[in-house]
């Protein structure tokens, strides 16, 4: 069958309307789409089988997943009285992930990440695979028992602030403030329950597309935008309070403007720089331990 015939045959098999209700354009490549989807369908099938096995296997596993009641207590869908109650879905996802990635198991903070994914996708299996992409690929060692990746990136942020916002770095040094005291929840929860929902969703779009660099962009933008306010602090409790306040207000609520700012405010931020800082910060942390 020549290319023209294959294209015509594919056009007859593939619906003109896509699954989201949109009509496909005249120049849509039906043959390429069919070829891609036939390959992708194999991947989806393998994933579905894997998910099914994990879910069945979780019955015999006893895991310390203790944060369910503290996951979005203000969200009616996570309350025990809800029907259906998303606590059960969250439990399934976390338990299955503990089986899938036993080096990580369950780590505090993952409940918020998984819970958000469940709210977004409304699907256990999709939430599981997105969680795997975050924990296993995009943010390796963030949620491992030693949390070395998380600790490293907090130190990287400190170095970036030292490079780009020296006055803020001097304030921290002058008061002996550890950055983990200020930003650990930003990194652990990926801004969930810290920034407004719509803003977090926009950040996560970039996180899945561009990788972990986006976390530094968000953090640097928050600090730079409020630099004068932060520099008014005169004590450690005052600094901590100001870092809580900078995650509130119109600046973070207006997500479109905020997302534009995170790509302009921090200035140049190459992966080469981040990789170099990660290597030096990780080595320093390992030397300390």
Curated annotation (Swiss-Prot):
Annotated GO MF terms: GTPase activator activity
Top-rank taxon: Eukaryota
GO cellular component: cytoplasm; plasma membrane
Pfam families given in the database record: RabGAP-TBC
Annotated TM spans: none
Alphabetically ordered keywords of this record: GTPase activation
Domain Rab-GAP TBC stretches: 41-211
InterPro entries referenced in this protein's UniProt entry, alphabetically: Rab-GAP-TBC_dom, Rab-GAP_TBC_sf, Rab_GAP_TBC_domain
PANTHER family, sorted: GROWTH HORMONE-REGULATED TBC PROTEIN 1 (PTHR47219:SF10), RAB GTPASE-ACTIVATING PROTEIN 1-LIKE (PTHR47219)
Main function: May act as a GTPase-activating protein for Rab family protein(s).
Record's protein name: Growth hormone-regulated TBC protein 1
Organism lineage string: Eukaryota, Metazoa, Chordata, Craniata, Vertebrata
